[in-house]
């Protein structure tokens, strides 16, 4: 480690940048690299101040290539078990790798910061 921090936008195309896998035929959310890399701090976007909410153009989700790092597993599992219904997980399971590295790591005001 060199002590260099790498921060990267989580993406500006919504949840998955595209809905086709690399073969161009299989429907699958396709999150953008390098935000999905566990060695990068992915920064998502928010909008409004009272209350501050996620910006719909920002991206987030789970990597199709990188497994969830050890420090995310408990928090992601808690989120999925508490806030995502079994029906939702079953339906979206064909499009999302729920065991992949979750992103973004942090979020900041992105739309009309004044």
Describe each model-derived feature in a short phrase.
Residues 1-114:
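Extracellular protease catalytic domains of secreted zymogens
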């Amino acid at each position: 480690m060199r002590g260099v921090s790498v921060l990267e936008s989580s993406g500006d195309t919504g949840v998955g940048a595209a809905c086709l896998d690399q073969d161009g035929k299989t429907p699958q959310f396709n999150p953008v690299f390098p935000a999905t890399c566990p060695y990068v701090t992915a920064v998502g976007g928010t909008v409004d101040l009272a209350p501050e909410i996620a910006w719909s153009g920002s991206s987030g989700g789970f990597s199709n290539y990188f497994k969830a790092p050890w420090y995310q597993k408990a928090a992601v599992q808690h989120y999925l078990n508490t806030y995502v219904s079994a029906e939702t997980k079953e339906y979206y399971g064909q499009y999302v790798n729920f065991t992949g590295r979750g992103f973004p790591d942090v979020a900041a005001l992105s739309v009309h910061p004044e």
